[in-house]
C-alpha cells in the first residue's frame, strides 16, 4: 500500500464490541460524507475487512486508498454517514455508520442499477443506524433515477440480510461458495429492490 508507512502495523486487533456509551439512532444525524470523515470511515471499514466476513474484501485501506475510494464516488454514487449529536452545536459528533452506492457493473446497460454497502461501527450496532443509512441511500437513489439497488451479502451476515429485507429487498439468487475469507468458503446472497416498487 503506497505511502502507508507504519499504517498497517498500527491497525488494531479485533476486540469484542463494547456497550455503546451514547444515545441510539434517535440522536443520529444523516448527511453526505465529507473528506474530513474519511479516517473514521476507514476505521469502520478496516475492522470489517480484517475481523469479519461482512465484506469479501481482504485488504485494509490506507489513507491514500481511502481518498481514492471517495473520489470514485461521484454525485451519482453518493456516500452518506451517520454522526452522533455533539455537545458543540458547531461541530459534528463521531461518525458511527456509513453507506454508499456504487456502480453495479461497468457495462453501460447496468448504469441505472446501483450496489449498496452499509457498515455500522462495531460498538454501535443494534440501535437502528443501519436502517437510517439504508433509507437515505434508497431516497438518494430515487432522486438520481436509479431503477434498482442490489446488495451482495455473505450468507452468514444475518443482520444485513434482515436489514435489507425490512426495507423492501428480496433475495434473487445465491452464489454458492463464491468467496473464500477467514479460512472458509462463503455463500453470497444477492438481494434487490426495484425503486419503482412500493
Regions inferred by a protein language model and the residue ranges of each:
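A structural signal for short, well-ordered beta-strand segments
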Residues: 116, 149-151, 191
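Acyl-donor-binding surface of acyltransferase catalytic domains
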Residues: 1-24, 193-195
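Acetyl-CoA-dependent GNAT
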Residues: 8, 59-125, 134-135, 140, ...
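Conserved acetyl-CoA-binding loop-helix of GNAT-fold acetyltransferases
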Residues: 126-141, 158, 162-166
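Conserved catalytic-core motifs of GNAT/GCN5-like acyltransferases
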Residues: 100-103, 108, 150-153, 165, ...
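Conserved GNAT-fold acetyl-CoA-binding loop/helix
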Residues: 42-69
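Conserved GNAT acetyl-CoA-binding A-motif
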Residues: 141-153
Amino acid at each position: 500500500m503506497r505511502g502507508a508507512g507504519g499504517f498497517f502495523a498500527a491497525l488494531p486487533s479485533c476486540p469484542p464490541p463494547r456497550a455503546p456509551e451514547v444515545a441510539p439512532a434517535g440522536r443520529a444525524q444523516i448527511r453526505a460524507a465529507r473528506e474530513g470523515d474519511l479516517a473514521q470511515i476507514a476505521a469502520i471499514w478496516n475492522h470489517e475487512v480484517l475481523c469479519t466476513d461482512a465484506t469479501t474484501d481482504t485488504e485494509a485501506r490506507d489513507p491514500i486508498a481511502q481518498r481514492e475510494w471517495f473520489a470514485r464516488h461521484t454525485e451519482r454514487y453518493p456516500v452518506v454517514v451517520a454522526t452522533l449529536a455533539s455537545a458543540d452545536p458547531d461541530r459534528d459528533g463521531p461518525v458511527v455508520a456509513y453507506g454508499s452506492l456504487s456502480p453495479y457493473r461497468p457495462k453501460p446497460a447496468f448504469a441505472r442499477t446501483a450496489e449498496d454497502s452499509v457498515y455500522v461501527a462495531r460498538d454501535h450496532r443494534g440501535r437502528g443506524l443501519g436502517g437510517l443509512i439504508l433509507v437515505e441511500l434508497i431516497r438518494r437513489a430515487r432522486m438520481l433515477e436509479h431503477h434498482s439497488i442490489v446488495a451482495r451479502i455473505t450468507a452468514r451476515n444475518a443482520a444485513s440480510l434482515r436489514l435489507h429485507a425490512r426495507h423492501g429487498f428480496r433475495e434473487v439468487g445465491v452464489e454458492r461458495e463464491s468467496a473464500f475469507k477467514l479460512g472458509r468458503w462463503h455463500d453470497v446472497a444477492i438481494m434487490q429492490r426495484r425503486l419503482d416498487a412500493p
